[in-house]
Amino acid sequence: MEKWWFNSMLSNEKLEYRCGLSKSTDSPDPIENTSGSEDRVINNTDKNINNWSQIKSSSYSNVDHLFGIRDIRNFISDDTFLVRDRNGVSYFIYFDIENQIFEIDNDQSFLSELESFFYSYRNSSYLNNVNSSYLNNVSKSNHPHYDRYMYDTKYSWNKHINSCINNYILSGSNNYSDSYIYSYICGQSRTRSEHGSSSKQTSTNGSDLKSSNVLYVAQKYRHLWIQCENCYGLNYKKNLKSKINICEQCGYHLKMSSSDRIELSIDPGTWDPVDEDMVSLDPIEFHSGEEPYKERIDFYQRKTGLTEAVQTGTGQLNGIPVAIGVMDFQFMGGSMGSVVGEKITRLIEYATNEFLPLILVCSSGGARMQEGSLSLMQMAKISSALYDYQSNKKLFYVSILTSPTTGGVTASFGMLGDIIIAEPNSYIAFAGKRVIEQTLKKTVPEGSQAAEYLFHKGLFDPIVPRNTLKGVLSELFQLHAFFPLNPKKIK
């Protein structure tokens, strides 16, 4: 059995017991151990690992140290923290009594069943009697590892939760079937000895249980977590914007709204949108069997707060005046219809007349089928305006390809930049993988439409991470003789 050792990484000020934590939850860095009088077990890693091997015969687990805190009443009400094992695998643990939530990330089946224990705990009289229980019981316990902050009234519940976490981690959850986790947490008659080879056992309803739990958790807790498309790790929603939508687990660049991208690139207080009131009038009166086109437009307008799939305007980037258009994939997949094409064309013409550098951020599924040939016309219209801007006026255009950039956008202005920048791991293609495979009856190699692969084929210039993009753009503009209005704004 592989042994594990926990280190607290992200915590809040309440988690100061034993570990001597000196950082707050605002810091993403690992918390250093600064206490000189730590608990003997915490201080000695080797001894601690030996204790893990004796967990079956011990009534006390080292996960108690994880929950050992100075004020459990504050902690248990609403708290989120992260623990990491010696191999670097991270686990989120989230408590919220008011909303009846107890979360442990990495196994949805484990999480779902563990919640039921938390609900019964929350509905008990613990919160009403916690102070008196503590005073009555703190002197009664003679347990050698008794923690005076873990009250006897619910110590058995706490011990059960700790035991669940212990066995979940020690089992190396990927090596054990869902039926094992399910039966253990639910207190079934089946014991661990009966699962000596549980990694090889299967359950008739195991896959159904896992699928239903994944769907249940994804729906119920989506207001708290965003799941990474690459590593499937969970990112705390409140912290994601400050991380510019980059996964904390693997560094994958998640999708961003157009408003967030504008906020990232444009100096505060300088954004001036144009053509905000331009909306589609359903030019070909397209109607599908499911939902009229006009109703779909109205739905996405309410959902995103935008009038169309692109925001255009002017602003300053490190003091340099620029014209910028940012597509939003959340609005009908960023599809390019007549309004999107018209707004981008007008922006290019304005930049041409004002001699401004131009940025277009692409995130689109291609031309909008609900507008037929009118949407296809936008490709030629935008390309024509760019020809005048680049070839006749000799101005500077930067296109930024984000995930996904496909279809008519790739075939027109997306690939016409003087400098073409791609975000890491972006999906960039003309036709999607499924369309190619269904049309040509051939398998598309995995990763052949990823930014890194296409970069080595010379399809675009640099791959620039989000956190350095603004600085790179600023240097490119100055290299092409576009300078800040106020030199002090150069970063």
From Swiss-Prot:
Disulphide bond pairs: none
GO cellular component: acetyl-CoA carboxylase complex; chloroplast stroma
Entry keyword annotation includes Zinc: yes
Zinc finger (C4-type): 228-250
Catalytically driven reaction(s): N(6)-carboxybiotinyl-L-lysyl-[protein] + acetyl-CoA = N(6)-biotinyl-L-lysyl-[protein] + malonyl-CoA
Cofactor remark from the record: Binds 1 zinc ion per subunit.
Subcellular location as annotated: Plastid, Chloroplast stroma
Cofactor: Zn(2+)
Any one biological process term the GO annotation gives: fatty acid biosynthetic process
Binding of Zn(2+), residues: 228, 231, 247, 250
UniProt GO MF annotations: acetyl-CoA carboxylase activity; ATP binding; carboxyl- or carbamoyltransferase activity; zinc ion binding
Keywords, comma-separated and alphabetical: ATP-binding, Chloroplast, Fatty acid biosynthesis, Fatty acid metabolism, Lipid biosynthesis, Lipid metabolism, Metal-binding, Nucleotide-binding, Plastid, Transferase, Zinc, Zinc-finger
Pathway in which the depicted protein is active: Lipid metabolism; malonyl-CoA biosynthesis; malonyl-CoA from acetyl-CoA: step 1/1
UniProt main location, coarse: plastid
E.C. number: 2.1.3.15
Ranges for domain CoA carboxyltransferase N-terminal: 224-491
Zinc-finger recorded as keyword: yes
Subunit structure: Acetyl-CoA carboxylase is a heterohexamer composed of biotin carboxyl carrier protein, biotin carboxylase and 2 subunits each of ACCase subunit alpha and ACCase plastid-coded subunit beta (accD).
Function: Component of the acetyl coenzyme A carboxylase (ACC) complex. Biotin carboxylase (BC) catalyzes the carboxylation of biotin on its carrier protein (BCCP) and then the CO(2) group is transferred by the transcarboxylase to acetyl-CoA to form malonyl-CoA.
Sequence similarity: Belongs to the AccD/PCCB family.
Protein name according to UniProt: Acetyl-coenzyme A carboxylase carboxyl transferase subunit beta, chloroplastic
Gene that specifies this protein: accD
